[in-house]
Design a protein with these regions (language model features):
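Short loop segments and helix-boundary regions at transmembrane helix junctions
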Residues: 26-31, 60-63, 70-115, 159, ...
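Loop-to-helix entry region at the N-terminal start of transmembrane alpha-helices
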Residues: 2-13, 56-57, 130-151, 209-211, ...
Length: 286
């Protein structure tokens, strides 16, 4: 049963990374690698609120989500929006996003150091036991957060006005403006929501495991792989791909050791990019 719990935990983290990354991609139509920063910022924000402000874990999590959402929106307005206004290609936006990620990742390392830090010690964390399996309270939060985000994003994409506006902006931003859609408002909301979800993932991972300056990309990469395998425009298949990827990843760790999990992820990513290299520089809407 513990293997099932481990799979659920890994799948929840992958789902959150995949769906938050997807939200930006389907609207802005480029690979936003700087989204990994939101995961790192969320982890360090939770650590800072927990240690410096003596906030309880619940408020540390909420504060990290709010702060990361604001930071992601600000980075879009300052760095990416001017490039998009000038008609920058998806490749240019990808390179700019990668540069932003590297600059701020090293900035985090300069401020907090390279060493891994623990937000919440395991000795202080409540642990629940179910038929021989164990889940910490943070792991329960992570699973609940992933389920909630998946349901809300699925319903929003299918039934809400914002979901229809998002699809219109993704299809043709200029035509959307003609029809009265505030494109900038939609894009800001997308980056706000995606960054907040990424920050929540970082905060929960930091409470459950540890934080480090490069943690964002380590957690984003499996999400990107699940997104590509499941299909960018089908949320339910992204969730299914995340569960399948987590299951195989757990099996790899169990039988071969944790050192092989990254090799597995990179192998799947390489195979997909080998078959569809155009995905990195823009893809046609299905």
């Amino acid at each position: 049963l513990q293997l099932v719990f481990n799979t659920l935990i890994a799948a929840s983290a992958i789902v959150l990374a995949a769906l938050s990354f997807r939200l930006v991609y389907v609207t802005a139509r480029f690979f936003h690698f700087a989204h990994a920063l939101t995961i790192s910022i969320g982890g360090y924000a939770a650590w800072s609120f927990f240690n410096y402000c003596a906030a309880n874990p619940y408020w540390a999590f909420l504060s990290a989500v709010i702060l990361t959402g604001a930071a992601g929106t600000l980075s879009f307005m300052v760095f990416l929006r001017p490039l998009m206004t000038k008609g920058a290609s998806p490749l240019v936006l990808l390179l700019a996003s990668l540069a932003i990620h590297l600059i701020f990742q090293h900035t985090i390392a300069l401020i907090f150091g390279e060493d891994a830090r623990s937000v919440w010690s395991l000795e202080q964390m409540p642990v629940y036991s179910f038929a021989g399996g164990h889940l910490t309270v943070v792991q329960c939060w992570l699973i609940a957060f992933a389920v909630g985000v998946s349901v809300l994003m699925g319903c929003s994409a299918s039934f809400s006005i914002f979901g229809k506006q998002q699809a219109a902006v993704a299809e043709h931003s200029e035509l959307s403006t003609i029809f009265g859609i505030d494109v900038l408002s939609v894009q800001m909301k997308v980056f706000l929501i995606a960054s907040a979800v990424g920050g929540g993932l970082g905060a929960l991972v930091g409470m459950d495991l540890s934080i480090s300056p490069g943690m964002g990309f380590d957690w984003l990469l499996p999400g990107v792989v699940a997104l590509l395998v499941g299909g960018i425009y089908r949320i339910r298949y992204v969730v299914l791909a995340s569960v399948m990827l987590a299951s195989v990843r757990t099996a790899v760790i169990w039988y071969l050791g944790s050192m092989w999990q990254d090799i597995f992820i990179y192998s799947v990513l390489f195979l997909y990019l080998f078959l569809r290299p155009e995905i990195l520089v823009g893809d046609e809407m299905q």
